Amino acid sequence: MQLLEKLWDETTPIHLRQIQTVEIMRLTWVHQYFVERGKVRLRPAKDLPPAGQRFDSPYDPEAHYANKRTTTWVGYKVHLTESCDENQMHLITNVLTTHAHLADVDQTEKVHKALKLKDLLPSEHIVDSAYVDSELLVTSQSRYEVTLIGPTRPNSSWQAKPLKHMI
């Protein structure tokens, strides 16, 4: 914090504030900390900017916070696609690296596009529930002739909840 205060002192040459590394450090501090009564405090999670809009690491401004169930990290996600044909070697057919905060379900079509470009589209694509929704079940077949196989998540919207009768 003292370094940032010195850099923004009116006697400090302005060009020092314009160094990219200094700006990344400043934004990381703004996103993660605040000063209260002269003391540096960590921002509560509820006051942080959304994961895709904040700097979570001064070392890599593209690395973002993510969580999946009980695991949390700052970095990226890697989506691997593997061939699973019987009596054949299992081979990695596609690697897609994304920002960690992006939803897995939004990567399914990107994987299919990449596999199509390489002429490696499977007739069936077995995935976990994070990569399936009702729209993808239809569009994977209609656009790519791929049968998407995987459990769908339960509908948790308010419309899907049982009606409670008013008394």
Question: What are the residue ranges of the model-derived segments?
Answer:
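Anion-binding and metal-coordination hotspots
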Residues: M1-I167
